[in-house]
Each structure stands twice: as C-alpha cells, then as structure tokens.
Curated annotation (Swiss-Prot):
Similarity comment: Belongs to the herpesviridae UL69 family.
Name of the protein described by the UniProt record: Immediate-early phosphoprotein 57
Biased composition (Polar residues): 127-138
One Pfam family here: Herpes_UL69
Record region (Disordered): 71-140
C-alpha cells in the first residue's frame, strides 16, 4: 500500500507540474502516458479493498496528445460599419450617390437608343421574301380602294369579315326583322310622378303648367315674382321627390322641340343662372338641379338647328364661318371647353352670334364653375349678369324680321317655318321670364 501511495503521489506531482507550466502548446510524452496507465491499474486493483470513505478524489486528466490554442481577441473598429447594396452601384440614387461618392451613370442619348439601320446585302437571296404570313390581311382586299378610305378602315380595325367584295351583298340578310316584328308598334308610357304638394303658390303654378304643353304666354311669369320666390323654387329644383322624372321629361321636350321652344328653354336657364348668381347659389347643386341639368342638351339641339339657316341669314363670310365653327365644335366634337375659349376672345356684334353665345352660356358657365383649370368663368359671368329676361326669344324675333326685309325666297320661308315650328311640345318648361 505504501508503494502504491508513492506511485500515486509521484504521478500527481508530475500532473501538477504540467498544468502549471506556462507553455501554450502541451505535448504529453509516451512515458507519462505509461505512468498514467499503471496508475489507473493500481487504482482499479485497490477499489475492492478500500472503503468508500478512504477512496481518493478522482483526478481530472487531459487526454493524451491534445493541443490547446488561445485565440487572440480581435480589436473592434471604432468607425461605423456602412453597408452598401450592389444595386446602388448599378443604379445609384441621387441622394445616396452624393453621400457615398458614387458617380451617377449618364443617361443614354437618343441616338444610342435607336437600332442600327438595316443594310441589306447586295445578294438578292439575302432579302426577306414577302410571304402571306407577314403581310396585313386587309392589304390585298383594299388594294383597289381609295387610299384615304383604306387608311380609315385600317385605323378602325374593321375585321376582314366586314369587307365587301365588288360583287358582294351590302348587308347580312339575316338581320332583317320578320313581318310580325315589322307590324308591331311600341307603346311609350308617360312618366309617372308621385303626388307632391307645394305650399308656395308660384311653385305650384309652375309645376302645373309644366306638366302640359301650352302657349308660352301661359307660362310667362314676371321676374319680380321669380326673385321673391327664389328660395322655394330652388328647394323644388334641388329636392323634389320627382326630380328624376322632371329631368327626363325636360330632356324629351328639348330633344323634340322647335327653335322657338328651344329659345324659351334658353331664356329659362339664363334667368335661373342670374337668380342664383345674385343669391350666391351653389354651382355644383345648380348643375344637378331640374332646370340646369338639361343645359348641354339644349345647347346641342339649338346649335343643330342654327346650322340649317346660317347660309341664308348670315351674308358676311366671317360671321358665317364663326357660327359654323362653334356649331361644329359643340355638335360633332363635343368640346365645350374649346368653344368657350374661342368665345371669350371675341366681341359679338351681330344678332345670330349673340343668340349662339346665349345658347352656349349655361353649359359653359356651369362647366367653368365646377371643373378646375378653366379660365373663361369670368367672361360667361359677365354674360349672365348682363342678360335681360326674354333676350334669346327677342333676338330670334328680331333676326327673322330683319332677314325678311331683304329675302323674298320662298324656299327660305319654308325652311324657317320648318325649323322654328312653334307648335311643338314644351312640356317641362317651368316658366318663361318676363321683364319687370
């Protein structure tokens, strides 16, 4: 036992010497490993003889031939780390480019974007042969058609099935209705209105006469009464329970009215605009009320009829050209902004021209006060402010009287009678303004 204790103490001393050494890399020799082997055998032999209280403490042994390295600690940089995406190098942002020193790539010139012109080889075999696949399918069918007409057909992208051959039929015969359908007549029911009681006497009188077609004298009201009852009339025009029915009734009457009744509708709208202008009404609400909703329809149908008699009524070339241009812009181009911009640059000095201006004014005035970026609102505000009751109808009467002083043509008389046609319906007309 004494000999085993001496061996254990000597092995322990050598182990402590190895652990206390300052060398970073420790290499355990074979001799030490043999001693440790004998030590382990001696410890195993005495485990049965020794009591648990007298057992030696286990000694932590490092495995043989293991190298231990100490990694030096890296010093951190005091400057902040900046991360730059490679996308910024290819497509640098203007702000980041100035901050990080990137140079912005110059934009390619227009010349560099253009593809290089195709230069065909002199060899005829190198030229692409025209095949039916790369040709326009309509080219062959339109080769004998007028180039202007062929260009319009191509722009409209009319399909090949709609192109007619020289000996073809003008339309598809299966579109023709049957004899039964041709003998039917559709019954158009009038607009149904709900019962609406009006306390104001003027409003009740206007609505009662507007439901029927009668003479303009029956619907005439003094401007004084209209001004005194303006707020009640405005409540009816904006908040009536039959608002949609009234609007449709007036549109139907305007579409089928003669020129005299169209002038009466224009006088009604001009007077209503002037009353709203004097009482600081809301133009957005006016644009959607019963009276002024039909301003575009009135302007369109009135100028359609003006175009029919300007050749005989207007002898001056510039007057005829101006009125014809305004009618064409409104009726065929739908450009109220272009027509209104043209009008504000002019001073009208002939009656038919002023009448056309009054047809345009309700439409252009509401357009300029509800659509931003319009610079002709002040011009048409002056037109509304300077309007006198019944001026549009008075201009028509004066123009016809002046014309018949010089014109004795029967054809002109028949044309004016057909256009004026005072016997047409004027349903929906609420009032005709009379001077005070």
């Amino acid at each position: 036992m004494a000999q085993q204790a001496i061996v254990t103490m000597s092995a322990l001393r050598r182990t402590m010497e190895v652990s206390d050494s300052g060398d970073v890399s420790i290499d355990i020799s074979a001799e030490d490993s043999n001693d440790s082997f004998h030590l382990e055998e001696s410890v195993d032999d005495c485990m049965d003889d020794c009591k648990p209280n007298n057992r030696p403490n286990p000694i932590s042994m490092k495995p043989a031939k293991r190298r231990v390295f100490m990694v030096p600690k890296r010093e951190r940089s005091k400057t902040p780390v900046q991360h730059t995406s490679p996308l910024n190098r290819l497509y640098p942002n203007v702000v980041l480019g100035k901050q990080h020193g990137y140079k912005q790539r110059p934009a390619p010139s227009a010349r560099s974007r253009r593809p290089q012109p195709y230069s065909a080889r002199k060899d005829s075999a190198a030229k692409p042969q025209s095949t039916p696949s790369n040709q326009n399918p309509l080219t062959e069918l339109l080769k004998n058609v007028d180039p202007a007409i062929a260009s319009r057909i191509t722009e409209m992208r009319i399909p090949r099935s709609m192109l007619r051959t020289p000996s073809g039929q003008p339309f598809a015969h299966w579109l023709m209705p049957s004899a039964e359908d041709s003998s039917k007549f559709i019954n158009v029911n009038p607009v149904n209105m709900e019962v609406e009681e009006h306390v104001n006497v003027v409003v009740r009188r206007c609505t009662e006469w507007a439901l029927i077609s009668s003479r303009l004298q029956d619907k005439s009201i003094s401007t004084k009464y209209l001004a005194e009852n303006f707020y009640d009339l405005r409540d009816f025009a904006q908040r009536s329970i039959n608002k949609s029915a009234w609007i449709n009734l007036r549109r139907e009457a305007i579409a089928n009215a003669g020129f005299v009744n169209l002038c009466a509708f224009a006088d009604e709208m001009m007077m209503w605009l002037q009353l709203n202008l004097n009482n600081q009404g809301s133009w957005k609400a006016c644009r959607e009320d019963i009276i002024l909703t039909g301003a575009p329809d009135m302007c369109f149908h009135a100028l359609q009829k003006v175009r029919a008699f300007i050749k005989c009524f207007l002898r001056e070339r510039h007057q005829r050209a101006l009125v014809n241009a305004l009618c064409h812009i409104i009726c065929f181009e739908g450009g109220i902004k272009q027509a209104a911009t043209l009008c504000q640059e002019l001073f009208f000095d002939f009656k038919v021209g002023l009448m056309v201006l009054y047809f345009l004014t309700p439409y252009a005035f509401l357009y300029s006060h509800t659509i931003p970026q319009c610079n002709f609102g002040g011009y048409f505000s002056k037109c509304v402010a300077q309007y006198t009751p019944g001026a549009v109808t008075g201009l028509l009467n004066s123009a016809i009287e002046d014309h018949y002083k010089d014109c004795t043509s029967q054809d002109c008389t028949n044309l004016i009678t057909a256009i004026v046609s005072p016997e047409t319906s004027n349903k929906g007309l609420l009032f005709f303004p009379l001077p005070m």
